[in-house]
Regions:
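N-terminal accessory targeting/assembly segments
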Residues: 1-47, 58
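Conserved beta-strand segments of alpha/beta enzyme cores
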Residues: 26, 187-189, 278
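C-terminal-of-GTPase-core extension/linker across diverse P-loop GTPases
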Residues: 60-182, 199-201, 213, 217, ...
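Conserved nucleotide-sensing/catalytic segment adjacent to the nucleotide-binding pocket
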Residues: 186-202
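Cytosolic ligand/metal-binding cores
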Residues: 205
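Redox-cofactor binding/interface segments in oxidoreductases and associated redox assembly factors
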Residues: 223
Length: 381
């Protein structure tokens, strides 16, 4: 490697590059050095992808996931899985060599137990993608509620700037406003949504439709209500919000500075008796109790055992797709085994599992996949 120290003039730098290229050098391609390391066997494909993830990480959580991956956590897990699958395949294929003698080298009970364990491990990795994806790209948080309840004021308070327009006129927010905030090393993507209500205004109606769409995509829903509203009215709003599987919802009683402590306490008690969800009182305008809100958000993510215990968490969409396919092939092998299919068909399903796992670490890959992966790298990596 040659390092050139020169004056900082752009012209001088360009001239040095021109002379180097004239003498036979060429510009490095994106990801070329990492690709060379992969092709030389210094790292597997999942580790190479982790290099790009480390460069692109914009939070401590995203960096932690990428660091675990580049240190070989994936490699060890998938090498172990592939070794077990290869053992199964070799026993099944050995039966084919002695097919005329009707001999079973692979005990079917043991085979079923091993496939069950392998399917569970692959499924657990695949299921971890939901957490890994939101940690890598930011946890989507939808702030929803009626018009003028203080959603935009809350976003401005969290950002410490006037990002969203605040007005006493209902329906001011018609389009979605999205901003990212880092809370203790985790990136949260806050979406300030249009107030939900019946309206004849077509533009406002479009904004409400977008709101409901983003609510379905959010990992966390913050339903903001007026702390002065009766608990029955708040309960009705809560029941109107669609909460999908895996989503979390918290009830935020805003404008607590205009309600008595007794009133807030009674509302909290009534609402928590009917709903097993967090209920928090804040004052977005006065920035009261916002620390409790940010702590609630952080804890909702960090409470996941796999994040705290250092378990493998999948954050790459390509890996998740391969794991889903591997899980499907493993399930087919299990069903085939239970149905008494022949060893050659069983071996074919297991080879398919091996293929999908091999695409993650690079044992099996194509030039198109490599081009797609390394084209995302910056020059010099």
């Amino acid at each position: 490697m040659l390092e050139i120290s020169c004056h900082g003039s752009t012209f001088i730098q360009q001239e040095i590059l021109r002379l180097c290229i004239r003498e036979g050098a060429r510009m490095a391609q994106g990801g070329e050095f990492t690709l060379k390391a992969f092709l030389a066997g210094k790292m597997d494909l999942s580790q190479a992808e982790a290099v790009a993830d480390i460069i692109a990480s914009d939070s401590r959580a995203a960096l932690t996931l990428a660091t675990r991956q580049i240190r070989g956590g994936y490699s060890k897990e998938f090498t172990d899985l592939r070794q077990q699958l290869l053992e199964l395949t070799s026993l099944l294929e050995l039966e084919l060599d002695f097919s005329e003698e009707d001999v079973e080298f692979a005990d079917r009970t043991r085979l079923s137990a091993m496939l069950t364990e392998i399917e569970h491990r692959i499924s657990s990795l695949s299921d971890s993608f939901r957490l890994g994806n939101i940690l890598k790209n930011g946890v989507p948080v939808a702030i929803v509620g009626s018009p003028n309840v203080g959603k935009s004021t809350l976003l401005n308070a969290l950002l410490n700037e006037e990002r969203a327009l605040v007005s006493d006129i209902a329906g001011t927010t018609r389009d979605l406003i999205e901003e990212t905030i880092n809370i203790q090393g985790v990136t949260f993507r806050f979406i300030d949504t249009a107030g939900i209500r019946d309206t004849a205004d077509p533009l406002e109606h479009m904004g409400i439709e977008r709101t409901l769409q983003r609510v379905r995509q959010a990992a966390i829903i913050l339903l903001m209500v007026d702390a002065n509203d009766p608990s029955e009215q708040i309960e009705a709003q809560l029941q109107s919000i669609p909460v999908g599987e895996g989503q979390q919802i918290a009830l935020i009683l805003n404008k607590s500075d205009k309600a008595t402590e007794e009133q807030i306490a009674l509302s909290k008690k009534a609402l928590q008796q009917k709903n097993a969800i967090p209920v928090l009182s804040i004052s977005a305008k006065q920035k009261g109790n916002l620390q409790a809100l940010t702590s609630l958000l952080y804890d909702s993510v960090h409470a996941d055992e796999s994040l705290r215990s250092g378990q493998l968490i999948v954050s790459n969409a390509r890996h998740h797709e391969a794991l889903e396919a591997a899980c499907g092939a493993t399930h087919r092998a299990q069903n085939g085994l239970a149905g008494g299919i022949s060893g050659d068909l069983l071996a074919q399903d297991i080879r398919e599992v091996l293929h999908h796992l091999g695409t993650i670490t690079g044992e099996i890959t194509s030039q198109d996949i490599l081009n797609s992966i390394f084209s995302k790298f910056c020059i010099g990596k």
